[in-house]
């Protein structure tokens, strides 16, 4: 009787294999290791099923397993943001362990339990060999129970089910295993990727069975929020195979796979195709990878741009919002790839731009507390340019004036832009000066210096001054944003700074009778301020004289704002804050400015400026 039962089982096993093989032809694809198959590694033994299964005398568990199991200890996936804990190991003989008996690379295919070592020719494709360090592979065989997290589908924990409407993506005994996503017997259920997936995974359908971008939990930010309408979900740009951004024909169809790899990812902690910003290179570095092509962002960094991080200061999603010692500027610091979008009409300042949807920022009121996600663009900039420690003057950005009125941390722009500041450009608050603004244009000028751009409004953005010199928003053809510019300090347009060998001495870079057009040395100021008004001395009687003599606005005016002028001899209206690298005191009289008398006292370019009879008298110094 026992012999008959075994024989019947063997017949059933072989019939099942035969029946499965006849479903759509060569359904097991490269898992058919027999000679003449499409697999890169083939063996001398006939019978495609027998490389994995044995009708009897195998390991003896449910799949009738025949391939020798790997007994390695694995280094599981981990990250600073994962809610899952513990040293997860795939249980020996269970689903994932069976897959790893070939795919960890420590046991050669063909090492069968029943038939011994089968002679094999060729080798497995390198992307299919995972090794024993699984930190760069999607987590599986988790320590149960699965820990809930805002980006996971609620049903995973509450019901032990995915949200896949087809039911193909499923938990295995309450856990995520290889067979949650892969069917080892059918290679082409997804006819494009042909990665033995349990279903078609175009448009991220397989990933979205477990990951929910729309879920909310009190007090927690979902990092996937915004995905549904994001540019990486909707972009119809065609991709080519050489781009290495997935198998599908468009960015939207590749979806998650445009940036992430479930196995052997180069950026392990986030399963990125490349480490940190390198994951963005495939699409955002120009070339023919996308059609139609998109602006080459990475070319901007070759100009004067935000510095790329070194290997020791990479971005981490769990890092402090205020970047102190670990200072860096990666794509992910300013952009959230899940929520980033593209629009043809921009919201009014100071609201964040669609390309920065979902990024974190810092509250301007204290410079420390989180605003996540940012509401206003400047909140994201303040992660580095606010109260953070470790800021330093970077020579690559060019000459930096030293102001007569300056706080202890002169690189902290928060007090400079503050509403309480005597005067400031209206970045973190609405324009509030009671003084007339005769030079202020109704609309900003585009890069050509002629056509009108955005309405001036009552607030401006950081990127109105710090932007690509060829940005699309103001009439160029390049990328928007402060990635890089040919002008110093990542300024959108040319702006020359007056410089002198010592305070009060001759300025060495004068621009007499300057070109006040878009090509001139002060083009940035002309974006918002009418040059003819300034040259008409409508707000100060010496404007035309100073400009025609070749002095820069920077000798007398600061760009961001004054901060507190308490205890100083400078009243601070109209951003008057002298560069003390250029000007010096006039004898014993400290550097001073009075808006009430519209006059100053200082020495500049070997000329003494002194208050006399309610006006400034300028005289050359005696030699």
Specify the residue positions occupied by each region the protein language model found.
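Sec/Tat signal peptide C-region and signal peptidase I cleavage site
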Residues: 17-21
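A motif-centric signal for short, conserved binding hotspots located
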Residues: 22-623
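Bacterial N-terminal signal peptides that target proteins for export
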Residues: 1-9
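Bacterial N-terminal signal peptides
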Residues: 8-16
């Amino acid at each position: 009787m026992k012999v008959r039962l075994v024989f019947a089982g063997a017949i059933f096993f072989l019939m099942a294999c035969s029946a499965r093989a006849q479903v759509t032809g060569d359904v097991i694809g490269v898992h058919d290791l027999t000679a003449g198959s499409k697999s890169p590694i083939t063996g001398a033994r006939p019978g495609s099923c027998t490389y994995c299964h044995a009708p009897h005398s195998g390991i003896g568990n449910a799949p009738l397993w025949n391939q020798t199991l790997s007994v390695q200890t694995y280094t599981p996936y981990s990250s600073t943001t994962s809610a899952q804990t513990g040293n997860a190991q795939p249980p020996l003989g269970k689903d994932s362990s069976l897959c790893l008996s070939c795919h960890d690379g420590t046991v050669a295919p063909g090492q069968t339990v029943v038939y011994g070592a089968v002679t094999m020719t060729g080798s497995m494709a390198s992307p299919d060999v995972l090794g024993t360090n699984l930190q760069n592979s999607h987590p599986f065989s988790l320590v149960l129970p699965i820990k809930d997290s805002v980006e996971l589908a609620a049903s995973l924990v509450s019901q032990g089910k995915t949200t896949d409407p087809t039911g193909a993506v499923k938990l295995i005994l309450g856990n995520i295993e290889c067979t949650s996503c892969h069917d080892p017997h059918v290679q082409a259920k997804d006819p494009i990727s042909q990665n033995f997936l349990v279903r078609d995974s175009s448009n991220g359908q397989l990933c979205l069975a477990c990951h929910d971008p729309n879920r909310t939990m009190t007090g927690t930010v979902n990092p996937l929020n915004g995905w549904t309408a994001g540019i990486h979900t909707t972009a119809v740009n065609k991709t080519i195979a050489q781009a290495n951004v997935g198998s599908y024909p468009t960015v939207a169809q590749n979806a998650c796979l445009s940036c992430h790899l479930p196995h052997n990812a180069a950026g392990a902690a986030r399963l990125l195709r490349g480490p940190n910003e390198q994951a963005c290179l495939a699409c955002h570095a120009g070339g023919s990878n996308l059609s139609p092509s998109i602006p080459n962002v990475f070319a901007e960094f070759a100009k004067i741009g935000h510095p790329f991080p070194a290997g020791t200061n990479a971005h981490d999603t769990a890092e402090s919002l205020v970047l102190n010692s670990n200072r860096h500027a990666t794509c992910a610091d300013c952009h959230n790839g899940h929520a980033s979008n593209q629009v043809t009409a921009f919201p009014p300042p100071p609201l964040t731009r669609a390309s920065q949807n979902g990024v974190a920022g810092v509250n301007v009121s204290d410079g420390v507390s989180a605003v996540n996600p940012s509401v206003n663009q400047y909140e994201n900039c303040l992660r580095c340019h606010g109260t953070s420690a470790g800021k330093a003057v970077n020579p690559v950005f060019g000459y930096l004036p030293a102001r007569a009125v300056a706080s202890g941390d002169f690189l902290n722009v928060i007090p400079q832009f503050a509403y309480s500041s005597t005067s400031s450009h209206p970045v973190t608050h609405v324009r509030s000066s009671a003084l007339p603004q005769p030079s202020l244009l109704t609309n900003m000028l585009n890069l050509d210096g002629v056509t009108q751009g955005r309405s001036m409004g009552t607030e401006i953005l950081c990127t109105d001054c710090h932007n690509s010199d060829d940005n699309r928003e103001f009439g160029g053809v390049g990328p928007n944003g402060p990635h890089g510019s040919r002008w110093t300090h990542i300024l959108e347009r040319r702006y020359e700074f007056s410089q002198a060998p010592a305070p009060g001495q001759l300025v060495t870079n004068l621009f007499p009778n300057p070109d006040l057009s878009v090509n001139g040395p002060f083009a940035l100021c002309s974006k918002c301020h009418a040059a003819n008004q300034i040259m008409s001395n409508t707000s100060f009687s010496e404007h035309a004289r100073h400009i025609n003599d070749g002095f820069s606005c920077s000798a007398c005016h600061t760009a961001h704002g004054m901060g507190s002028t308490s205890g100083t001899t400078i009243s601070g209206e109209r951003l008057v804050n002298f560069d003390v690298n250029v000007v010096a005191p006039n004898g014993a009289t400290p550097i001073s400015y009075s808006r009430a008398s519209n006059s100053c006292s200082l020495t500049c370019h070997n000329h003494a400026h002194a208050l006399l009879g309610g006006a400034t008298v300028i005289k050359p110094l005696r030699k």
